Amino acid sequence: MGAAFFYAGAMDVFTKTVSRPDQAGAEAAGLRWLAQALAAVVVDVTEVTSSSLSTRRVEQARPSAPAARAFGAALRTVHEAGAPAFGAPPAGWEGANFIGRVEQPCEPCESWGEFYAEQRVLPFVDGLPQGVQGIVRQACEAIKAADWDVKPARIHGDLWAGNVLFTADSAVMIDPAAHGGHPWTDLAMLELFGTPFYEEILRGYGAPKEYEKWVPMHQLHPLAVHAMTHGPAYYAPLEQAARSTLEALR
C-alpha cells in the first residue's frame, strides 16, 4: 500500500500513504470489523484519510510457541464472529476491496465455491500462460461444483507472516483484505510464505486433521495474485496447487 513512514513527534503512531483513495478506507474498515470480534489481536486504527492510514504502534516481541498458540486461539475467535455471506465486505464498507495494492471483487455470495473461484482466483489468471490458466480453470470448475459444509467466517484475507506482528503473549494482525470467507484460507496463507511457530498456531486454533488436505486449494488465491504481479516464479507453484486441488476433489 504505498510508502510508509512515522509522523515526526508521534512515534507511537505508524502512518502510511496510499495510492488510491479507497485503499485506506478499505483497510480501516477491515481492521475495525475484525476488531469487533477481538480487539486484542488487531492493530488499533487512530486516523484514516483519503490518502493515509494511521495505526497505533505495536510493541513487538520475539515469536514464541506460547504466543503462537494464543494467537491461533484468538484467530479462531475472530473467524467464529462470522460474516453475512461469502464475499461480504467489512460492515459498513461500500468501496473497493484490495489485497495489497491489487483491487479484487467482493460481492456477497451464498456459495463458498462460487465465491472463491469467481472472485478470488479467476480474476487473476487471464494473463498467465495457457497451460497454467487451463489447469487453474479446471480446478475452479471443480471447486464450484463441490458441496462445502462451511459457514462464512470473518477472515483477514491476506494473512501472511508479514501481517502478523508477534507480541509478548500473542500476535496482532495488520493490513487485512477482510471479507466473509472460509476460515482455512487464513491458515493456508500463514503456511504458504512461512510463519514462525506455524504448527503452534494450528494447535492453538484447533485445526482438524483434514485441513492439511485442502491447503493447496486455499493457496490458489495468493498464488494467483503473485503469479499476476510477480510473474513466472509463481507459475509452477500455482499449477501444482491446482493439480493438488483436483486430486483432493476426486
Report each predicted region and the residues it spans.
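Short, low-complexity, intrinsically disordered N-terminal peptides in bacterial proteins
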Residues: 1-12, 247-250
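ATP-binding pocket architecture of kinase catalytic cores
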Residues: 4, 11-114
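ATP/Mg2+ or Mg2+-diphosphate-binding catalytic cores
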Residues: 20, 226-250
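Alpha-helical elements of Rossmann-like donor-binding domains used by nucleotide-donor carbohydrate transfer enzymes
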Residues: 26-33, 70-77, 138, 200, ...
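Short strand-connecting beta-turns/loops that link adjacent beta-strands
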Residues: 50, 168-170, 220
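An alpha-helical support segment within catalytic cores of ATP-dependent transferases
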Residues: 83-154
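Active-site Asp-x-Gly
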Residues: 105-117, 150-154, 161-216, 232
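Short helix/strand-capping connector loops at secondary-structure junctions
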Residues: 217-226
